[in-house]
């Protein structure tokens, strides 16, 4: 009788597992399909401009007319990539705001709005260009695009430590933490020319800036030396976390892809981060800039403040974002102003 009961319980357990595993597999397949859909819907800045007929440029920045743009070219491939040579003519209706060269390179001169037209062999195409001093830089837009592209491409698949990002950075097998390496890979892919902290020129007028440092602390040191380690997030900035339990200031680094100002110093921040549970993850959380830690040093770390919180549950609307915090003992240390 006892043996029969044990066999019955075992069969019931096996039946439950058979029901559970197909359901889990189906859920994972649905998630992968959603990742693939998001990837197919993702648009580079130029592609978005072609579709919408609108483009934004930060004052002083340049970008090719969307329809002739070569796309987002990694820095280490730019030398071998020819400049566009489109047929036809370009013109701006307000050169005090935007000028355009004969090959379609638009340059933002001053805040305002201008319409740039391309008279091509196939007919006229027009783009309304908005210029502003506070807009995200062109390379910042590219960086956000690349980060999202990598996130949707990896689709939360588990990666080895010696993955495509580590291979690109180290050029030889090296199994180490790769959160900083992931940011450098994406920065290069976006067109940044990452530099070593040791090569930093404190007198140089850097505009767009990224550090080729596989150690999180070295990235922080570089931004901090230039006064570009800040307490307010912007898309395209890096974000460095502090371990409150150990008071370790540079425990991990990710990158900001979206920011929503909620008022009173509170921001909803969305990030893409490598080397989280051996994959690439996206997080969305609330950050309180009134409790910024960016000016804390090793001598003053006893004053570190907790400044992260979960969004209200009713705002957990994107199945591809993680709304649960990384841990219960991390806080934002600060943000690296890459542009």
Question: What is the predicted role of each segment?
Answer:
Residues 132-195, 336-338:
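N-terminal capping segments
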Residues 274-299:
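Glycine- and charge-enriched low-complexity intrinsically disordered segments
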Residues 132, 257-258, 287, 334-339:
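Short beta-strand-to-coil "C-cap" segments at the C-terminal boundary of structured domains/repeats
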Residues 1-39:
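Gram-positive cell-envelope targeting signals
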